[in-house]
Amino acid sequence: RETLDAVALLYMATQIASGMSYLEARNYIHRDLAARNCLVGDNKLVKVADFGLARLMRDDTYTAHAGAKFPIKW
């Protein structure tokens, strides 16, 4: 296992943020962003995966029903 320094972790975090921004620009909400859903490849290239809970946002706002177990759009 490779130890990751702060620079590598920041690089990976910015890739994840960029991927989430890409989804938001296309009106999608991932709803399950977690380390287990981030695939790391060669040269620490990160891909956001597992869109099983993803939803297309049709309105400008997104709300959850009572008792929902996922966060609303932040």
Curated annotation (Swiss-Prot):
Supply the InterPro entries for this chain: Kinase-like_dom_sf (IPR011009), Prot_kinase_dom (IPR000719), RTK (IPR050122), Ser-Thr/Tyr_kinase_cat_dom (IPR001245), Tyr_kinase_AS (IPR008266)
Q: Where is the active site?
A: D32 (proton acceptor)
Keywords, comma-separated and alphabetical: ATP-binding, Cytoplasm, Kinase, Nucleotide-binding, Transferase, Tyrosine-protein kinase
Name the enzyme's class: transferase
| Gene Ontology MF term list | ATP binding; non-membrane spanning protein tyrosine kinase activity; transmembrane receptor protein tyrosine kinase activity
Superkingdom of the organism of origin? Eukaryota
- PANTHER family named among the record's database cross-references: SERINE_THREONINE_TYROSINE KINASE 1, TYROSINE-PROTEIN KINASE RECEPTOR
Q: What is this protein called?
A: Tyrosine-protein kinase ABL
